[in-house]
Design a protein with these regions (language model features):
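Nucleotide/phosphate-binding sheet-loop regions of phosphoryl- and nucleotidyl-transfer enzymes
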Residues: 1-388, 421-424, 431-436, 442, ...
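Short beta->alpha connector loops at strand-helix junctions that form conserved
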Residues: 40, 447-449, 468-471, 559, ...
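Conserved alpha/beta-domain cores
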Residues: 92, 516, 526-877
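Structural motif
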Residues: 237, 407, 424-426, 445, ...
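Glycine-rich phosphate/ribose-binding loops and adjacent secondary-structure elements
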Residues: 329-331, 431-439, 443-445, 451-457, ...
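C-terminal domain-closing interface element
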Residues: 333-335, 490-538, 544
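Protease-associated
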Residues: 357-440, 503-509, 520, 524-527, ...
Length: 877
């Protein structure tokens, strides 16, 4: 019989695929002899089976769960629902990859009216017993039965108002007993049946809820953002309760072995006395710093710091730990490699190498490339910052600078950002439902919560700026306003805040580009040492090219020449060319553009200092260049000596029903060879001039013909380019080599790659944006209308325009490389779609033997690191 359930004593850290991260680490801590409450893990395979069985737990799995409850009862001497010594458990999710705040927890399971009375009498602490029960009813109702938390919070607030108290901890045992009754009445009203009293029924409901939560909307969003496959499933951990809410000698906390915001080697964390675990993470009360624990319970603090050292030495990484103190007894509830900011990740990795704990390869492998993005984001301008006076200071939860218009809900943040507004999200506290709004905002500011609250952890993970626990804010969410430092702020008012200092400012403060710190350079140098894949950039302007070079780009993989036509007066000349009747007229118009285009290419060659520059010839259809405004149409008519009506007729004739597959790319060069001739002359003249000024540079222009689908098509355009280039070189008496290649963006080109190479192609560059469009038959501009439905229906797990489709598009790439290199082994191949900066796509590019990836300038460090990680992972296999 298959094993679906494991005691903590039966697992270890290597079993995370089966036991999930939390279960594997609880087993590992148990093996290390640390104080971990007894428990067992229901495997990720059981979750997958639950979905295969139509969202039911089959008898075999159910039987094993009950067997393990009996084993726990034997080990602990406690029994589920017992009148003498009742067993209470927590039920927590635990996927193999950490998903903070994405999945739901239930504490105090096993309670009912009778058990509460037993606990109350045994402990002599009725307040604690009733506090546990009201928490359990609230959590179970929310997580298992999906009765909103807010209904229960409202009842608590009413009770506190009635009793004229501010904190939950000031409620008496009698108050909490009344609350439990009110909660059960609320449950019955919403669900239509009594709250369950049988602990086994409660457990079954809780396990199903954890399995269900694997497929809730926020978990799906997090998985898509973090490349976590749906098929992994989540494990469920059932663990004997340790109670942090038994009074002032009990508590609960979260701690990191190093600072997750800065990387400093110093224990950082928070705890709350007389509280349960969720109180700290949910950020409902603002907790105390971990150092205070040494004053309150020195022995517990010493034991805890020793455990921290043990865990960091064991895992050789910064640990994020949850603990509970029950009447001065310490229990470890979780450890995992801690989420951290990009800045902290770099410092921790470098420090661990310097401390002799890990190798350079390990340091490179432990950094999430996507998080580097936040290091390249703006910071506040120092001068502007000095001139500004903070109106308040709170906890610096996630670094960076945020400035924008205030919004109060995640929905508004998303909607305003979609309109192009820069917004900051101001909340009492955030919850997992806010995740998309948090992504859309420039930064997050919360009234409650500490450094380990949901807002702080999620913001750090996504590289967003966050300031938390600003209790000086008087919030009025219903009317979308708050008061701070005597001023009332409404939706749309502008504020700024600094996630590195915790300072909050009225109005806008200017931002500047981030300065790359020393550790960044070290990690990048190590990455460059281990990677084999080159990294180029997509750049059309000298400033983009220079920025990319600063960030480590080794050339330009895609220069889109059409962007150059829109600058200054040259659009007028290009429009004249489009509206010309004869080849001669077109050539005259293009002659005006040639020196301007040549100047553009010279600047790019200079910025790249002899590194490769791939120039793609004109790609978009001509209708994208024609005027739409009446004044511009009149100007063009005057220039061409035609009537406005004639120009409008030409514009109308350029309209296409399906422009993506219409008169564009190499088809323009076939119908208007003079465009290709002009662009070739500009490329070659620029190269000759720059090479003359810098003979030490190895300057070999790469001319890329777009949208080729047939070898004869390529041969036709190549002939035009070659004749023009050779003529220019001869005329200048220069010595210049150049290459002519093509973009592979039509499936037919991939399938006939050998024929295209035989026709003279010297390099391939995969334009995966169009290749994905044409392989899937999706329009990139319109797919947003249906992709969400595809995610919900489990047809797709990721946006194929963001993450390369390995099975379809990837196979076409492999076919093209294999067939192309069979004819010309030295054929060099790259990728220049958006996928060039996506880490998982970069990994695939390494695996199939591409020579380079090309991405936008700010994604160059991400691609460099991802390429190194792919090489290191490949070597390990």
């Amino acid at each position: 019989m298959k094993k679906w359930v494991y005691l903590f004593t039966e697992g270890n850290a290597d079993m995370r695929n089966l036991l999930g991260g939390k279960g594997a680490n609880l087993a590992e801590m148990t093996n290390l002899g640390l104080p971990v409450p007894q428990g067992f893990t229901i495997t990720t395979e059981a979750c997958t089976q639950y979905y295969e069985d139509g969202k039911t737990i089959n008898d075999e799995i159910m039987g094993q769960i009950m067997d393990h409850i009996e084993k726990m009862e034997e080990i602990t001497g406690k029994k589920f629902g017992d009148k003498e010594n009742p067993l209470l458990v927590s039920v927590r999710s635990g996927a193999r990859a950490s998903m903070p705040g994405m999945m739901d927890t239930i504490l105090n399971l096993g309670l009912n009216e009778e058990v509460v009375e037993v606990l109350s009498a045994k402990s002599g602490n009725p307040r604690w017993a009733w506090d546990c029960y009201r928490r359990f009813i609230q959590m179970y109702s929310d997580v298992v039965m999906e009765v909103g938390k807010k209904y229960f919070e409202e009842l608590i607030d009413e009770m506190k108002k009635e009793k004229e108290i501010e904190q939950d901890v000031d409620l008496t045992a009698e108050d909490l007993k009344r609350l439990a009754e009110q909660f059960k009445a609320e449950y019955k009203e919403k669900i239509g049946e009594d709250f369950p009293v049988d602990p086994k029924e409660q457990l079954l409901g809780a396990v199903k809820a954890v399995f269900r939560s694997w497929d809730n909307p926020r978990a799906n969003v997090y998985r898509r953002d973090n490349d976590i496959p749906y098929s992994w499933g989540t494990a469920v951990n059932v663990q004997m309760m340790a109670f942090g809410n038994m009074g002032e000698t009990s508590g609960t906390g979260v701690a990191f072995t190093r600072n997750p915001a800065t990387g400093e080697k110093k224990l950082m964390g928070e705890f709350l006395l007389n509280a349960q675990g969720e109180d700290v993470v949910a950020g409902v009360r603002t907790p105390q710093p971990i150092a205070k624990l040494e004053e309150i319970m020195p022995e517990v603090f010493k034991q805890f710091t020793d455990i921290c050292d043990t865990l960091e030495d064991h895992y050789r990484d910064m640990q994020d730990m949850e603990f509970t103190i029950e009447d001065k007894h310490l229990y470890m509830l979780q450890t995992r490699n801690g989420k951290r900011t990009a800045k902290a990740a770099l410092k921790i990795a470098c420090d661990l190498v310097d401390e002799g704990m890990i190798t350079e390869e390990k340091a490179v492998s432990m950094i999430d490339p996507r998080n580097l993005d936040s290091l390249l984001h703006p910071q506040f301008d120092e001068k502007a910052l000095k001139a500004a006076t903070p109106i308040a200071k709170a906890l610096a939860a996630a670094p960076g600078a945020a400035c924008g218009k205030v919004v109060f809900t995640a929905e508004d943040a998303k909607a305003w950002a979609a309109r192009g507004e820069k917004v900051v999200l101001v909340r009492l506290e955030t919850s997992p439902e806010d995740i998309e709004g948090m992504k859309a905002a420039q930064g997050i500011l919360t009234v409650r919560g500490g450094m380990t609250s949901h807002a702080a952890v999620v913001a750090r993970g996504m590289g967003a700026c966050c300031v938390s626990g600003c209790s000086a804010i008087i919030m009025d969410e219903a009317n979308k306003r708050f008061t701070l430092a005597g001023k009332e702020y409404h939706e749309g008012d502008v504020i700024s805040f600094d996630g590195t200092t915790g300072n909050i400012y009225d109005g806008e403060i200017r931002t500047v580009d981030a300065v790359i710190a020393g550790e960044f350079g070290r990690i990048m140098a190590w990455a460059d040492k281990y990677r084999s894949l080159r990294v180029r950039t997509n750049a059309d302007t000298p400033s983009d090219a220079r920025k990319a070079r600063e960030l480590g780009a080794e050339g330009i993989g895609l220069c889109r020449t059409e962007h150059m036509f829109f600058e200054g007066d040259r659009i007028d000349a290009f429009r004249e060319m489009i509206c010309s009747d004869t080849t001669k007229e077109r050539e005259e118009a293009l002659e005006k553009i040639l020196p301007l285009q040549q100047g553009d290419f010279e600047k790019l060659y200079e910025a790249m200092e002899g590194n490769p520059v791939t120039i793609r010839f004109l790609d978009p259809p001509l209708h994208e260049f024609v005027p739409t405004e009446e004044a511009d149409i009149k100007k063009l008519a005057d220039a061409k000596g035609k009537s406005v009506e004639e120009i409008k007729a030409i514009i109308d004739s350029l309209h296409e029903f399906n422009p993506m597959m219409g008169h564009r790319g190499c088809r323009l060069a076939v119908t208007y060879p003079e465009i290709a001739r002009m662009q070739t002359a500009a490329v070659i003249r620029a190269a000759i001039k720059v090479k003359g000024e810098h003979p030490e540079w190895k300057l070999v222009p790469e001319i890329m013909i777009p949208l080729i689908g047939d070898n004869k098509e390529f041969a036709f355009v190549r002939k035009i380019v070659k004749e023009t280039a050779d003529e220019e070189i001869k005329k200048a008496g220069a010595d210049l080599s150049y290459e002519i290649g093509t973009m592979i963006e039509i499936p037919r080109a991939a399938l006939t790659a050998d024929e295209i190479v035989k026709a003279g192609a010297e390099f391939f560059c995969f334009g995966t944006n169009d290749l994905t469009q044409m392989t899937y038959g999706f329009s990139r501009d319109d797919s947003g209308k249906f992709l969400e439905a595809y995610y919900n229906a489990k047809i797709l797990e990721n946006d194929p325009f963001a993450k390369l489709d390995r099975n379809g598009v990837g196979q076409l790439m492999e076919v093209a490389i294999e067939r192309g290199k069979k004819v010309k082994p030295e054929l060099h191949c790259g990728i220049c779609g958006e996928h060039g900066g996506d880490p998982s796509s970069v990994e695939f590019c390494h695996q199939i033997g591409l020579d380079y990836v090309s991405c936008s300038p700010f994604r160059v460090p991400i691609a460099r690191l991802a390429a190194a990680q792919a090489a290191i992972a490949g070597k390990a296999k």
